[in-house]
Swiss-Prot record:
Protein name: Putative nickel insertion protein
Keyword Membrane: no
HAMAP family reported in the protein's UniProt record: LarC
Upper classification of the organism: Bacteria, Bacillati, Chloroflexota, Chloroflexia, Chloroflexales
UniProt keyword Calcium, yes or no: no
Organism: Roseiflexus sp. (strain RS-1)
Keywords from the named record: Nickel
Pfam family, one: Ni_insertion
Length: 411
């Protein structure tokens, strides 16, 4: 059963509230600090303290960082995160969050993503907040993120551009980009920050899933209010037995995905006048923005010119974002689209214990039958480096232990 987390945003969401809630739910503060130190940026401190606010006990997380005068671009932040020795899921999720932030800022200020200079969002404490939340999810083994409707708050707040209405324009742009549900809450404070909105817009599905609950965490915000200023997270394992109808729906969609409103969209465009490194950048952007798959095919175009067909299979609710990336990042004048249906195998992840060390294995299921399994590359590569053995040897060792039930741990 996949590990899932539900963000219960009854008083909004911010980066520090999310950090506190994850620590309260079981993330080791030492492990989290160690993960963040891999960014290679010094000067920050991460503190967490237990507090009682009214009827609730929880954790207040606080990032202390020197005043940061760097106005980083998305390219700067991408390079910082991608160059750090972090798990691939942490890198991909973190970059996806910052990409959404850049796109929201560009829409609000009427500029392009490349011209956006992050101020508050690009400050060191915000980088630690965002990468810290993603690292915390990874340390908890979370595979899927869910969230409740979001109360944005009301009133006014100070920003680098002067006073702005609440919700902040960037917050609204982020929530609108994914069609996030919001509540009619008139609390005269900023309940949801751009950082919090970006985290959920990039990672969450907005519904409460059936789960077998394992832990609950409360993360407090800095402001003290009459009601608890807290974010609650529910950590658990997706449980088919808790909802038979949901189970049937999930199994059907896993095998025959793409019917009705959930049909993915296939986007295609032909390019014959851009260098290969720019095409590679476009495909990377599409994947970071949430494409299900991206591929390129060599083609012959008019006048015998060699070209490339860029194709992206994308969720329907992300179609506009993907089309915008293709139009902005390539020389194309148009993008073809069509709704498609697809068959998708159900999958799960187990951990296999071997003499070389533990490694995760992704298993493939079709109509209740196990039809394939593949070791996770990141785990095998780490073991190969640590043990000084060939990568192929690690793969063979992991696959050889699959049949031994005592070596397998279900997630």
């Amino acid at each position: 059963m996949p590990r899932v987390i539900y963000f219960d945003c009854f008083s909004g969401v911010s980066g520090d509230m999310a950090l506190g809630a994850l620590i309260d739910a079981g993330v080791s503060l030492d492990d989290l600090r160690a993960m963040l130190q891999r960014l290679g940026v010094g000067g920050w401190e991460l503190h967490a303290s237990r507090e009682v606010r009214g009827p609730l006990a929880g954790t207040r997380a606080h990032v202390v960082a020197p005043e940061d005068h760097h106005h980083r671009t998305l390219t700067d932040i991408r390079a910082l995160i991608a160059g750090a020795p972090l798990p691939s899921a942490v890198v991909e999720r973190s970059i996806r969050i910052f990409t959404l932030l850049a796109e929201a800022e560009a829409r609000v200020h009427g500029t392009t993503v490349d011209q956006v200079h992050f101020h508050e969002v690009g400050a060191l404490d915000a980088i630690v907040d965002i990468v810290g939340v993603v690292a915390g999810l990874d340390l908890l083994g979370v595979e899927q993120v869910f969230a409740s409707p979001i109360p944005p708050g009301a009133g006014w707040v100070r920003s680098a551009h002067g006073p702005i209405p609440v919700p902040a324009p960037a917050t609204l742009a982020l929530l609108a980009s994914v069609g996030a549900p919001v509540t009619a809450d008139e609390t005269p404070f900023e309940l949801t920050t751009p950082t919090g909105a970006a985290i959920l817009a990039a990672l969450a599905t907005f519904r409460r899933p059936p789960m077998r609950l394992r832990a609950v965490g409360y993360g407090f915000g800095a402001r003290r209010m009459e009601r608890p200023n807290a974010l609650r997270v529910w950590l658990g394992d997706m449980d088919d037995e808790t909802d038979v109808d949901q189970d049937r729906q999930d199994r059907t969609s896993a095998e025959h995905a793409g019917s009705g409103e959930s049909s993915p969209v296939l986007l295609e465009t032909n390019i014959d006048d851009q260098p290969a490194e720019q095409i590679a950048y476009v495909t990377e952007r599409l994947r970071e923005a949430g494409a299900l798959d991206v591929w390129c095919t060599p083609i012959m175009m008019k006048k015998g010119r060699a070209g490339v067909l860029i194709a992206a299979l994308v969720p329907a609710d992300l179609e506009d974002r993907m089309v915008t990336i293709l139009l902005r990042e390539t020389t194309t004048l148009g993008v073809r689209r069509r709704a498609v249906e697809r068959y998708v195998c159900a999958r799960d992840i187990i951990t296999v214990t071997t003499p070389l060390g533990p490694a995760r294995v992704k298993r493939k299921w079709w109509r209740g039958e196990l039809i394939g399994a593949a070791p996770e590359y990141e785990d095998c590569a780490r073991i190969a480096r640590e043990r000084g053995v060939p990568l192929t040897t690690v793969y063979q060792t992991v696959m050889g232990r699959l049949e031994d039930a005592s070596s397998v741990t279900e997630h």
